[in-house]
Amino acid sequence: MSADSQSIAATENEEKSHEVPGNVQHCGDMLSGQEETVPLGTSQESTHIKAEPEEPHSEGASREDRTPGTQRWMSPCPGPKDKGPFLPGGVVPSPWTPVLSRGGRTRERKMAAALLTAWSQMPVTFEDVALYLSQEEWGRLDHTQQNFYRDVLQGKNGLALGAVEMGKVVPALAVATLEDTKSIRTRARWAPGEDPKCGQHVASGPGTKLTRDTGKAGQLKPAPSESRPLKTPEDSGPEKPSEGEEALKSGEEGLVPDGDTGKKTYKCEQCGKGFSWHSHLVTHRRTHTGEKPYTCTDCGKRFGRSSHLIQHQIIHTGEKPYTCPSCWKSFSHHSTLIQHQRIHTGEKPYVCDRCAKRFTRRSDLVTHQGTHTGAKPHKCPICSKCFTQSSALVTHQRTHTGVKPYPCPECGKCFSQRSNLIAHNRTHTGEKPYHCLDCGKSFSHSSHLTAHQRTHRGVRPYSCPLCGKSFSRRSNLHRHEKIHTTGPKALAMLMLGAAAAGALTAPPPAST
Protein backbone atom coordinates (compact mmCIF):
# COMPACT_ATOMS: atom_id res chain seq x y z
CA MET A 1 0.00 0.00 0.00
CA SER A 2 1.38 3.42 -0.98
CA ALA A 3 2.00 6.25 1.44
CA ASP A 4 -0.90 8.23 -0.04
CA SER A 5 -3.33 5.35 0.45
CA GLN A 6 -2.21 4.92 4.04
CA SER A 7 -2.70 8.66 4.61
CA ILE A 8 -6.24 8.52 3.25
CA ALA A 9 -7.12 5.49 5.39
CA ALA A 10 -5.71 7.08 8.53
CA THR A 11 -7.60 10.26 7.82
CA GLU A 12 -10.91 8.41 7.37
CA ASN A 13 -10.40 6.55 10.66
CA GLU A 14 -9.64 9.79 12.44
CA GLU A 15 -12.78 11.40 10.99
CA LYS A 16 -14.95 8.51 12.21
CA SER A 17 -13.50 8.77 15.67
CA HIS A 18 -14.24 12.47 15.68
CA GLU A 19 -17.92 11.86 14.85
CA VAL A 20 -18.56 10.08 18.16
CA PRO A 21 -20.47 12.47 20.49
CA GLY A 22 -18.91 13.30 23.75
CA ASN A 23 -15.28 13.76 22.71
CA VAL A 24 -13.95 16.00 25.45
CA GLN A 25 -11.50 18.72 24.51
CA HIS A 26 -10.12 21.62 26.46
CA CYS A 27 -12.03 24.75 25.50
CA GLY A 28 -8.95 26.82 26.14
CA ASP A 29 -7.16 24.90 23.41
CA MET A 30 -10.21 25.16 21.16
CA LEU A 31 -10.60 28.94 21.16
CA SER A 32 -7.21 30.39 22.05
CA GLY A 33 -5.43 29.93 18.73
CA GLN A 34 -4.19 32.51 16.25
CA GLU A 35 -4.96 30.74 13.00
CA GLU A 36 -7.89 32.26 11.08
CA THR A 37 -10.17 29.53 9.81
CA VAL A 38 -13.37 29.44 7.81
CA PRO A 39 -15.37 26.26 7.16
CA LEU A 40 -16.28 25.17 3.70
CA GLY A 41 -19.97 25.83 3.13
CA THR A 42 -20.22 23.54 0.07
CA SER A 43 -18.74 20.28 -1.06
CA GLN A 44 -16.87 21.94 -3.90
CA GLU A 45 -13.40 23.40 -3.82
CA SER A 46 -14.03 27.13 -4.11
CA THR A 47 -12.30 30.45 -3.68
CA HIS A 48 -13.64 30.70 -0.13
CA ILE A 49 -10.77 28.56 1.18
CA LYS A 50 -8.41 30.77 3.13
CA ALA A 51 -4.65 30.42 3.08
CA GLU A 52 -3.01 29.52 6.34
CA PRO A 53 0.51 30.33 7.46
CA GLU A 54 2.72 27.33 7.68
CA GLU A 55 4.32 26.50 10.99
CA PRO A 56 7.17 24.22 11.96
CA HIS A 57 5.92 20.90 13.26
CA SER A 58 7.13 19.09 16.30
CA GLU A 59 8.71 15.69 16.12
CA GLY A 60 5.74 14.14 17.89
CA ALA A 61 3.31 15.30 15.27
CA SER A 62 1.17 12.80 13.43
CA ARG A 63 1.86 11.50 9.96
CA GLU A 64 -0.67 13.85 8.45
CA ASP A 65 1.00 16.83 10.15
CA ARG A 66 4.41 15.78 8.83
CA THR A 67 3.16 15.75 5.25
CA PRO A 68 4.98 18.53 3.39
CA GLY A 69 2.93 21.50 2.27
CA THR A 70 -0.16 20.73 4.31
CA GLN A 71 -1.74 21.87 7.52
CA ARG A 72 -4.12 20.04 9.89
CA TRP A 73 -7.42 19.83 8.00
CA MET A 74 -9.44 17.54 10.27
CA SER A 75 -7.93 18.71 13.54
CA PRO A 76 -10.26 18.45 16.54
CA CYS A 77 -8.71 21.52 18.16
CA PRO A 78 -6.53 24.36 16.89
CA GLY A 79 -3.07 24.55 18.35
CA PRO A 80 -2.24 26.78 21.28
CA LYS A 81 -1.02 29.48 18.92
CA ASP A 82 -3.94 29.22 16.51
CA LYS A 83 -6.79 31.69 16.48
CA GLY A 84 -10.05 29.83 16.69
CA PRO A 85 -13.17 30.71 14.73
CA PHE A 86 -15.64 33.13 16.29
CA LEU A 87 -19.39 32.98 15.76
CA PRO A 88 -21.52 36.15 15.99
CA GLY A 89 -23.75 36.04 19.02
CA GLY A 90 -21.17 34.16 21.04
CA VAL A 91 -22.11 30.67 19.84
CA VAL A 92 -19.31 28.13 20.03
CA PRO A 93 -18.72 26.57 16.58
CA SER A 94 -18.17 22.91 15.95
CA PRO A 95 -14.47 22.01 16.13
CA TRP A 96 -14.78 19.31 13.45
CA THR A 97 -14.95 21.69 10.50
CA PRO A 98 -12.44 20.77 7.74
CA VAL A 99 -9.78 23.43 7.17
CA LEU A 100 -7.54 23.47 4.08
CA SER A 101 -4.55 25.52 3.03
CA ARG A 102 -3.63 26.63 -0.43
CA GLY A 103 -0.28 24.90 -0.12
CA GLY A 104 -1.71 21.41 0.24
CA ARG A 105 -1.29 18.68 -2.32
CA THR A 106 -3.88 18.31 -5.07
CA ARG A 107 -4.62 14.69 -4.09
CA GLU A 108 -5.32 15.61 -0.48
CA ARG A 109 -7.44 18.60 -1.50
CA LYS A 110 -9.55 16.32 -3.69
CA MET A 111 -9.83 13.86 -0.82
CA ALA A 112 -11.07 16.65 1.47
CA ALA A 113 -13.68 17.64 -1.11
CA ALA A 114 -14.84 14.02 -1.34
CA LEU A 115 -15.13 13.78 2.43
CA LEU A 116 -17.14 17.00 2.49
CA THR A 117 -19.48 15.54 -0.12
CA ALA A 118 -20.09 12.49 2.04
CA TRP A 119 -20.35 14.67 5.14
CA SER A 120 -23.06 16.81 3.48
CA GLN A 121 -25.31 13.76 3.23
CA MET A 122 -25.17 13.09 6.96
CA PRO A 123 -27.51 14.58 9.58
CA VAL A 124 -25.96 17.72 10.99
CA THR A 125 -26.78 20.23 13.64
CA PHE A 126 -26.89 23.98 13.50
CA GLU A 127 -23.15 24.30 14.09
CA ASP A 128 -22.49 22.71 10.69
CA VAL A 129 -24.28 25.51 8.82
CA ALA A 130 -23.55 28.41 11.12
CA LEU A 131 -21.85 31.68 10.28
CA TYR A 132 -18.15 31.56 11.11
CA LEU A 133 -16.01 34.66 11.61
CA SER A 134 -12.66 35.07 13.25
CA GLN A 135 -12.50 37.43 16.19
CA GLU A 136 -10.31 39.82 14.22
CA GLU A 137 -12.80 39.92 11.34
CA TRP A 138 -15.66 40.42 13.76
CA GLY A 139 -13.83 43.35 15.37
CA ARG A 140 -13.40 45.07 11.98
CA LEU A 141 -17.17 45.15 11.42
CA ASP A 142 -19.13 48.22 12.45
CA HIS A 143 -22.31 48.03 14.53
CA THR A 144 -24.62 47.90 11.49
CA GLN A 145 -22.73 45.02 9.89
CA GLN A 146 -22.67 43.08 13.14
CA ASN A 147 -26.44 43.45 13.49
CA PHE A 148 -26.87 42.35 9.88
CA TYR A 149 -24.88 39.16 10.43
CA ARG A 150 -26.81 38.47 13.61
CA ASP A 151 -30.04 38.81 11.61
CA VAL A 152 -28.70 36.37 9.03
CA LEU A 153 -27.71 33.98 11.81
CA GLN A 154 -31.19 34.07 13.31
CA GLY A 155 -32.84 33.46 9.95
CA LYS A 156 -34.39 36.95 9.65
CA ASN A 157 -35.31 38.69 6.37
CA GLY A 158 -35.75 35.31 4.68
CA LEU A 159 -31.99 34.68 4.36
CA ALA A 160 -30.62 31.17 4.65
CA LEU A 161 -27.92 30.54 7.19
CA GLY A 162 -24.48 30.40 5.61
CA ALA A 163 -20.77 30.82 6.10
CA VAL A 164 -19.43 34.39 6.17
CA GLU A 165 -15.98 35.32 4.88
CA MET A 166 -14.60 38.84 4.90
CA GLY A 167 -18.02 40.47 5.04
CA LYS A 168 -19.52 38.36 2.22
CA VAL A 169 -22.44 35.96 2.72
CA VAL A 170 -21.73 32.55 1.19
CA PRO A 171 -24.72 30.28 0.29
CA ALA A 172 -25.23 27.78 3.08
CA LEU A 173 -24.86 24.06 2.82
CA ALA A 174 -28.24 23.66 4.44
CA VAL A 175 -31.18 25.77 5.52
CA ALA A 176 -31.64 25.65 9.27
CA THR A 177 -35.09 24.89 10.52
CA LEU A 178 -36.97 27.04 12.99
CA GLU A 179 -36.15 24.69 15.84
CA ASP A 180 -32.44 24.90 15.02
CA THR A 181 -32.63 28.69 14.93
CA LYS A 182 -34.35 28.85 18.31
CA SER A 183 -31.87 26.44 19.83
CA ILE A 184 -29.00 28.87 19.23
CA ARG A 185 -29.77 30.64 22.47
CA THR A 186 -29.56 27.40 24.42
CA ARG A 187 -25.92 26.84 23.50
CA ALA A 188 -22.91 28.09 25.41
CA ARG A 189 -22.14 31.67 24.48
CA TRP A 190 -19.24 34.09 25.02
CA ALA A 191 -19.22 37.77 24.15
CA PRO A 192 -16.63 39.16 21.69
CA GLY A 193 -13.27 39.43 23.41
CA GLU A 194 -14.26 37.05 26.20
CA ASP A 195 -12.53 33.67 26.42
CA PRO A 196 -13.48 30.75 28.64
CA LYS A 197 -11.11 29.95 31.43
CA CYS A 198 -8.65 27.10 31.14
CA GLY A 199 -9.58 23.83 32.69
CA GLN A 200 -13.14 23.93 31.37
CA HIS A 201 -14.08 20.97 29.22
CA VAL A 202 -16.32 21.05 26.20
CA ALA A 203 -18.08 18.01 24.80
CA SER A 204 -17.88 18.30 21.06
CA GLY A 205 -18.62 16.36 17.96
CA PRO A 206 -21.36 16.11 15.32
CA GLY A 207 -24.83 16.13 16.78
CA THR A 208 -23.67 17.71 20.04
CA LYS A 209 -24.92 20.97 21.51
CA LEU A 210 -23.31 22.96 24.26
CA THR A 211 -25.30 24.25 27.20
CA ARG A 212 -24.30 25.81 30.48
CA ASP A 213 -24.28 23.49 33.44
CA THR A 214 -26.21 25.27 36.17
CA GLY A 215 -24.92 22.81 38.72
CA LYS A 216 -21.30 23.99 38.59
CA ALA A 217 -20.22 27.49 37.75
CA GLY A 218 -18.13 27.75 34.59
CA GLN A 219 -18.83 24.17 33.46
CA LEU A 220 -20.48 23.15 30.21
CA LYS A 221 -22.35 19.99 29.50
CA PRO A 222 -23.56 18.31 26.29
CA ALA A 223 -27.23 18.55 25.40
CA PRO A 224 -29.24 15.83 23.65
CA SER A 225 -28.60 15.54 19.97
CA GLU A 226 -31.17 17.17 17.72
CA SER A 227 -29.60 16.62 14.33
CA ARG A 228 -31.72 16.91 11.22
CA PRO A 229 -31.21 15.86 7.56
CA LEU A 230 -29.80 18.44 5.22
CA LYS A 231 -32.07 20.51 2.99
CA THR A 232 -30.66 22.25 -0.04
CA PRO A 233 -32.52 25.10 -1.76
CA GLU A 234 -32.75 23.06 -4.96
CA ASP A 235 -34.06 19.87 -3.38
CA SER A 236 -36.36 21.31 -0.75
CA GLY A 237 -39.98 21.23 -1.81
CA PRO A 238 -43.02 22.67 -0.09
CA GLU A 239 -42.86 21.92 3.60
CA LYS A 240 -45.42 19.65 5.14
CA PRO A 241 -47.83 21.60 7.31
CA SER A 242 -47.50 21.10 11.02
CA GLU A 243 -50.08 19.32 13.12
CA GLY A 244 -51.45 22.62 14.35
CA GLU A 245 -51.89 23.93 10.81
CA GLU A 246 -53.61 20.73 9.70
CA ALA A 247 -55.91 20.92 12.70
CA LEU A 248 -56.82 24.51 11.90
CA LYS A 249 -57.58 23.60 8.29
CA SER A 250 -59.65 20.57 9.20
CA GLY A 251 -61.52 22.38 11.97
CA GLU A 252 -60.50 19.96 14.67
CA GLU A 253 -62.47 20.47 17.85
CA GLY A 254 -60.62 22.42 20.49
CA LEU A 255 -58.33 24.24 18.05
CA VAL A 256 -60.90 26.13 16.00
CA PRO A 257 -63.17 28.36 18.11
CA ASP A 258 -66.85 27.72 17.65
CA GLY A 259 -67.32 31.45 17.22
CA ASP A 260 -65.46 31.22 13.87
CA THR A 261 -67.60 28.38 12.55
CA GLY A 262 -70.91 29.91 13.64
CA LYS A 263 -71.87 26.86 15.69
CA LYS A 264 -73.44 27.17 19.12
CA THR A 265 -72.19 24.03 20.77
CA TYR A 266 -72.39 25.27 24.35
CA LYS A 267 -75.90 24.86 25.73
CA CYS A 268 -77.29 26.12 29.00
CA GLU A 269 -78.59 23.20 31.05
CA GLN A 270 -81.42 25.25 32.58
CA CYS A 271 -82.89 27.25 29.71
CA GLY A 272 -81.33 25.55 26.66
CA LYS A 273 -79.86 28.74 25.23
CA GLY A 274 -76.87 28.15 22.94
CA PHE A 275 -73.56 29.99 22.80
CA SER A 276 -70.56 29.93 20.47
CA TRP A 277 -68.04 30.50 23.26
CA HIS A 278 -67.72 28.72 26.56
CA SER A 279 -66.96 32.00 28.35
CA HIS A 280 -70.32 33.37 27.23
CA LEU A 281 -72.04 30.32 28.70
CA VAL A 282 -70.24 30.84 32.01
CA THR A 283 -71.39 34.46 32.11
CA HIS A 284 -74.94 33.45 31.21
CA ARG A 285 -75.12 30.91 34.02
CA ARG A 286 -74.75 33.75 36.53
CA THR A 287 -78.20 34.98 35.54
CA HIS A 288 -79.61 31.73 36.96
CA THR A 289 -77.36 31.43 40.00
CA GLY A 290 -77.36 35.12 40.89
CA GLU A 291 -73.58 35.10 41.26
CA LYS A 292 -71.96 38.54 41.08
CA PRO A 293 -68.18 38.14 41.42
CA TYR A 294 -67.21 41.69 40.45
CA THR A 295 -67.42 44.22 43.29
CA CYS A 296 -67.06 47.99 43.16
CA THR A 297 -64.37 49.10 45.59
CA ASP A 298 -66.06 52.49 46.12
CA CYS A 299 -69.63 51.56 46.99
CA GLY A 300 -69.54 47.76 47.31
CA LYS A 301 -72.07 47.16 44.55
CA ARG A 302 -71.65 43.79 42.84
CA PHE A 303 -71.98 42.86 39.18
CA GLY A 304 -72.12 39.66 37.17
CA ARG A 305 -69.92 41.01 34.37
CA SER A 306 -66.67 42.92 34.44
CA SER A 307 -67.92 45.25 31.68
CA HIS A 308 -70.84 46.28 33.88
CA LEU A 309 -68.45 47.07 36.71
CA ILE A 310 -66.33 49.24 34.42
CA GLN A 311 -69.42 51.15 33.29
CA HIS A 312 -70.53 51.59 36.87
CA GLN A 313 -67.19 52.98 38.03
CA ILE A 314 -67.61 55.95 35.71
CA ILE A 315 -70.37 57.13 38.06
CA HIS A 316 -67.83 57.58 40.86
CA THR A 317 -65.27 59.36 38.70
CA GLY A 318 -67.86 61.78 37.32
CA GLU A 319 -66.51 61.38 33.81
CA LYS A 320 -69.00 62.07 31.00
CA PRO A 321 -67.19 61.60 27.71
CA TYR A 322 -70.28 61.26 25.48
CA THR A 323 -71.91 64.55 24.41
CA CYS A 324 -75.14 65.05 22.50
CA PRO A 325 -74.46 67.15 19.36
CA SER A 326 -77.99 68.62 19.48
CA CYS A 327 -78.21 69.95 23.04
CA TRP A 328 -74.59 69.40 24.21
CA LYS A 329 -75.73 67.33 27.15
CA SER A 330 -73.07 64.89 28.36
CA PHE A 331 -73.44 61.29 29.44
CA SER A 332 -71.20 58.75 31.10
CA HIS A 333 -72.25 55.85 28.85
CA HIS A 334 -72.62 55.64 25.10
CA SER A 335 -75.85 53.65 25.37
CA THR A 336 -77.38 56.44 27.46
CA LEU A 337 -76.47 58.95 24.76
CA ILE A 338 -78.17 56.83 22.11
CA GLN A 339 -81.33 56.65 24.21
CA HIS A 340 -81.21 60.41 24.78
CA GLN A 341 -80.88 61.18 21.08
CA ARG A 342 -84.22 59.49 20.47
CA ILE A 343 -85.81 62.40 22.30
CA HIS A 344 -84.65 64.69 19.49
CA THR A 345 -85.40 62.30 16.64
CA GLY A 346 -88.68 60.96 18.05
CA GLU A 347 -87.59 57.41 17.33
CA LYS A 348 -89.38 54.67 19.26
CA PRO A 349 -87.95 51.34 18.12
CA TYR A 350 -89.54 49.11 20.78
CA VAL A 351 -93.10 48.07 19.97
CA CYS A 352 -95.54 46.16 22.15
CA ASP A 353 -96.79 43.09 20.27
CA ARG A 354 -100.21 43.30 21.96
CA CYS A 355 -101.28 46.92 21.75
CA ALA A 356 -98.68 48.25 19.25
CA LYS A 357 -97.59 50.96 21.66
CA ARG A 358 -94.06 52.16 20.99
CA PHE A 359 -91.27 53.03 23.40
CA THR A 360 -87.83 54.60 23.21
CA ARG A 361 -86.31 52.22 25.76
CA ARG A 362 -86.44 48.48 26.08
CA SER A 363 -86.90 48.74 29.83
CA ASP A 364 -90.01 50.86 29.30
CA LEU A 365 -91.41 48.18 26.99
CA VAL A 366 -90.76 45.45 29.56
CA THR A 367 -92.49 47.52 32.21
CA HIS A 368 -95.45 48.12 29.92
CA GLN A 369 -95.81 44.44 29.03
CA GLY A 370 -96.37 43.76 32.72
CA THR A 371 -99.69 45.61 32.42
CA HIS A 372 -100.91 42.99 29.93
CA THR A 373 -99.65 39.92 31.72
CA GLY A 374 -100.09 41.22 35.25
CA ALA A 375 -96.87 39.47 36.24
CA LYS A 376 -94.99 41.06 39.11
CA PRO A 377 -92.24 38.59 40.01
CA HIS A 378 -90.26 40.91 42.29
CA LYS A 379 -91.74 41.01 45.79
CA CYS A 380 -90.70 43.20 48.69
CA PRO A 381 -89.84 41.01 51.72
CA ILE A 382 -90.98 43.72 54.16
CA CYS A 383 -94.38 44.81 52.90
CA SER A 384 -94.99 42.06 50.28
CA LYS A 385 -95.55 44.65 47.55
CA CYS A 386 -94.77 43.27 44.09
CA PHE A 387 -93.07 44.93 41.14
CA THR A 388 -92.50 44.11 37.51
CA GLN A 389 -88.81 45.08 37.58
CA SER A 390 -86.03 44.41 40.04
CA SER A 391 -84.85 48.03 39.80
CA ALA A 392 -88.28 49.20 40.93
CA LEU A 393 -88.04 46.86 43.92
CA VAL A 394 -84.61 48.24 44.85
CA THR A 395 -85.96 51.78 44.67
CA HIS A 396 -88.99 50.82 46.76
CA GLN A 397 -86.87 49.23 49.49
CA ARG A 398 -85.25 52.59 50.13
CA THR A 399 -88.57 53.78 51.52
CA HIS A 400 -88.16 51.19 54.27
CA THR A 401 -84.46 51.73 54.92
CA GLY A 402 -84.50 55.50 54.47
CA VAL A 403 -81.40 55.41 52.28
CA LYS A 404 -80.99 58.46 50.03
CA PRO A 405 -77.74 57.92 48.13
CA TYR A 406 -78.13 60.78 45.64
CA PRO A 407 -77.18 64.18 47.14
CA CYS A 408 -77.56 67.50 45.34
CA PRO A 409 -74.12 69.10 44.83
CA GLU A 410 -75.67 72.59 45.12
CA CYS A 411 -77.81 72.46 48.25
CA GLY A 412 -76.94 69.07 49.72
CA LYS A 413 -80.49 67.73 49.60
CA CYS A 414 -80.58 63.94 49.23
CA PHE A 415 -82.91 61.79 47.17
CA SER A 416 -83.67 58.11 47.00
CA GLN A 417 -83.90 58.06 43.21
CA ARG A 418 -81.57 59.46 40.59
CA SER A 419 -84.46 60.75 38.51
CA ASN A 420 -85.63 62.87 41.44
CA LEU A 421 -82.15 64.35 41.78
CA ILE A 422 -82.04 65.20 38.08
CA ALA A 423 -85.44 66.87 38.29
CA HIS A 424 -84.35 68.77 41.40
CA ASN A 425 -81.20 70.08 39.72
CA ARG A 426 -83.38 71.92 37.22
CA THR A 427 -84.63 74.14 40.02
CA HIS A 428 -81.05 75.43 40.34
CA THR A 429 -80.31 75.71 36.63
CA GLY A 430 -83.77 76.94 35.56
CA GLU A 431 -83.82 74.43 32.71
CA LYS A 432 -87.23 73.58 31.25
CA PRO A 433 -86.70 71.02 28.50
CA TYR A 434 -90.33 69.89 28.12
CA HIS A 435 -92.45 72.04 25.80
CA CYS A 436 -96.17 71.94 25.11
CA LEU A 437 -96.88 71.61 21.40
CA ASP A 438 -100.26 73.34 21.75
CA CYS A 439 -99.35 76.55 23.60
CA GLY A 440 -95.53 76.44 23.72
CA LYS A 441 -95.35 76.52 27.50
CA SER A 442 -92.25 74.89 29.00
CA PHE A 443 -91.87 72.71 32.06
CA SER A 444 -89.01 71.30 34.09
CA HIS A 445 -90.66 67.92 34.64
CA SER A 446 -92.26 65.61 32.13
CA SER A 447 -95.10 64.88 34.56
CA HIS A 448 -95.92 68.58 34.66
CA LEU A 449 -96.15 68.63 30.87
CA THR A 450 -98.41 65.57 30.88
CA ALA A 451 -100.75 67.17 33.44
CA HIS A 452 -100.77 70.44 31.48
CA GLN A 453 -101.72 68.73 28.23
CA ARG A 454 -104.90 67.45 29.90
CA THR A 455 -106.15 71.03 30.16
CA HIS A 456 -106.14 71.20 26.36
CA ARG A 457 -107.84 67.84 25.94
CA GLY A 458 -110.28 68.14 28.84
CA VAL A 459 -109.22 64.81 30.33
CA ARG A 460 -109.82 64.40 34.08
CA PRO A 461 -108.77 60.89 35.10
CA TYR A 462 -108.83 61.41 38.89
CA SER A 463 -112.28 61.17 40.54
CA CYS A 464 -113.33 61.59 44.16
CA PRO A 465 -114.85 58.36 45.54
CA LEU A 466 -117.16 60.31 47.93
CA CYS A 467 -118.71 62.94 45.71
CA GLY A 468 -117.61 61.85 42.23
CA LYS A 469 -115.89 65.09 41.30
CA SER A 470 -113.09 64.70 38.71
CA PHE A 471 -109.70 66.34 38.41
CA SER A 472 -106.89 66.50 35.84
CA ARG A 473 -104.14 66.15 38.43
CA ARG A 474 -103.68 63.76 41.29
CA SER A 475 -102.51 66.58 43.56
CA ASN A 476 -105.82 68.39 43.05
CA LEU A 477 -107.70 65.23 44.04
CA HIS A 478 -105.70 64.91 47.26
CA ARG A 479 -106.45 68.53 48.08
CA HIS A 480 -110.15 67.92 47.48
CA GLU A 481 -110.28 64.82 49.67
CA LYS A 482 -109.29 66.87 52.70
CA ILE A 483 -112.62 68.63 52.47
CA HIS A 484 -114.37 65.37 53.26
CA THR A 485 -112.11 64.42 56.17
CA THR A 486 -111.23 67.70 57.97
CA GLY A 487 -112.59 71.23 58.58
CA PRO A 488 -116.04 72.64 59.52
CA LYS A 489 -117.47 71.75 56.17
CA ALA A 490 -116.50 68.18 56.60
CA LEU A 491 -118.06 68.17 60.11
CA ALA A 492 -121.33 69.60 58.81
CA MET A 493 -121.45 67.03 56.08
CA LEU A 494 -120.86 64.27 58.60
CA MET A 495 -123.71 65.57 60.79
CA LEU A 496 -126.04 65.81 57.86
CA GLY A 497 -125.09 62.36 56.84
CA ALA A 498 -125.66 60.98 60.33
CA ALA A 499 -129.02 62.71 60.61
CA ALA A 500 -130.09 61.40 57.28
CA ALA A 501 -129.00 57.93 58.23
CA GLY A 502 -130.86 58.18 61.58
CA ALA A 503 -134.05 59.35 59.94
CA LEU A 504 -133.93 56.44 57.60
CA THR A 505 -133.30 53.90 60.34
CA ALA A 506 -135.46 55.44 63.19
CA PRO A 507 -138.53 53.36 64.16
CA PRO A 508 -142.02 54.84 63.42
CA PRO A 509 -143.68 56.80 66.29
CA ALA A 510 -146.07 54.84 68.49
CA SER A 511 -149.83 55.52 68.06
CA THR A 512 -151.90 56.78 70.99
Swiss-Prot record:
What the record says about family reads: Belongs to the krueppel C2H2-type zinc-finger protein family.
Entry's InterPro entries? KRAB (IPR001909), KRAB_dom_sf (IPR036051), Znf_C2H2_sf (IPR036236), Znf_C2H2_type (IPR013087)
One cellular-component annotation, GO:
nucleus
Positions with biased composition (Polar residues) = 1-10
| Gene Ontology biological process terms in this record | negative regulation of transcription by RNA polymerase II; positive regulation of hydrogen peroxide biosynthetic process; positive regulation of mitochondrial outer membrane permeabilization involved in apoptotic signaling pathway
Record keyword Nucleus present:
yes
**Which residue spans adopt a coiled-coil conformation according to this UniProt entry?**
none
Q: Which Pfam families does the annotation name?
A: KRAB, zf-C2H2
State the name under which the record lists this protein.
Transcriptional repressor Rhit
Database matches in SMART domains? KRAB, ZnF_C2H2
Question: Key word DNA-binding present in the record?
Answer: yes
Query: Which keywords does the record carry?
Result: DNA-binding, Metal-binding, Nucleus, Repeat, Repressor, Transcription, Transcription regulation, Zinc, Zinc-finger
Q: What is the lineage of its organism?
A: Eukaryota, Metazoa, Chordata, Craniata, Vertebrata
Q: What is its main location?
A: nucleus
Q: Where is the composition biased (Basic and acidic residues)?
A: 47-67, 228-252
This protein's domain notes = The KRAB domain is required for transcriptional repression.
Species name: Mus musculus (Mouse)
User: What triggers expression?
Assistant: Repressed by heat.
Q: Where in the cell is it found?
A: Nucleus
As for what it does, the entry says:
Transcriptional repressor that binds to the promoter region of Mpv17l isoform M-LP short and regulates its age-dependent and heat-induced expression. By regulating Mpv17l expression, contributes to the regulation of genes involved in H(2)O(2) metabolism and the mitochondrial apoptotic cascade.
**Region spans: Disordered:** 1-104, 187-261
Zinc finger residue ranges, C2H2-type: 266-288, 294-316, 322-344, 350-372, 378-400, 406-428, 434-456, 462-484
Q: Select a single GO molecular function from the record's annotations and give it.
A: DNA-binding transcription repressor activity, RNA polymerase II-specific
Q: Name the gene for this chain.
A: Zfp13
